[in-house]
């Protein structure tokens, strides 16, 4: 497959993850660095269900459910109590980093350090615009497109989506206008967690093989995509994911693939230094 094809698949997976990550940050004001850990744990839940003879496409729903439940629990048990104490935002970020380390290395202690793979067929290979894509990769792109359309519909045309946007813009004003902000925040954790679980599973499908620390550098890609598009901007996150996915994979054709995350890190540093509110955000976003 061409580097553009690899970039397209990477962007599709990253788009699902980044949109959930951005929504979570925008509505809840929590920069959840444990997002990658929840992704890989969800991928393993899908793997365990798949090992019992269930199709990976059905087992995928177990991963989505895991991401939603774990994210909701993290908010209720850990993040909300810290936020109620009116601590500095960086404190919650550090707490989320600790949660990430516990989630990743706790999983590694349970499953070991060996690589695993799903029981699935890659399907026929298709030639399209100079790219060779497997059936699974085409399905992943289709899932990404479907999810992004659903997120657009949710945010634009539903009462829940409008309440989420209002809570993100001004939580106190939304509360005074009758929006049940705590309920909206809980629903945001569930929805973004479901996206996290889905992203973890399709990430593992695309990787072919994975292990407990496969998410190690993924948070850098998430942060780069989010800050490129704009913190709290779901549509910006879609663009950021496409740009980061393509740039990291295309650059891997010219430098060793082991260092392709460096491109994302440089983008992240550049955005933080010169335009921290992103290409699609505004200064009031931060």
For the regions a language model picked out, list residue spans one by one:
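Membrane-interfacial amphipathic/re-entrant helices at transmembrane-helix boundaries
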Residues: 1-16, 45, 54-59, 85-91, ...
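Inter-helical junctions in multi-pass inner-membrane proteins, predominant
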Residues: 1-13, 155, 188-225, 232, ...
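Membrane-embedded helix boundary and interhelical linker motif in transport proteins
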Residues: 5, 27-73, 77
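Short, non-helical or kinked segments that cap or interrupt transmembrane helices
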Residues: 21-42, 56, 86-90, 160-163, ...
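Alpha-helical transmembrane segments within multi-pass membrane transporters and channels
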Residues: 54-99, 239-244, 275-276
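Transmembrane helix-bundle core of multi-pass membrane transporters
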Residues: 81, 88-157, 184, 250, ...
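Cytosolic-side transmembrane-helix boundaries in multi-pass membrane proteins
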Residues: 110, 169-176, 180-183, 255-286
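Helix-loop-helix "hairpin" substructures at the membrane interface of multi-pass membrane proteins
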Residues: 132-210, 234-240
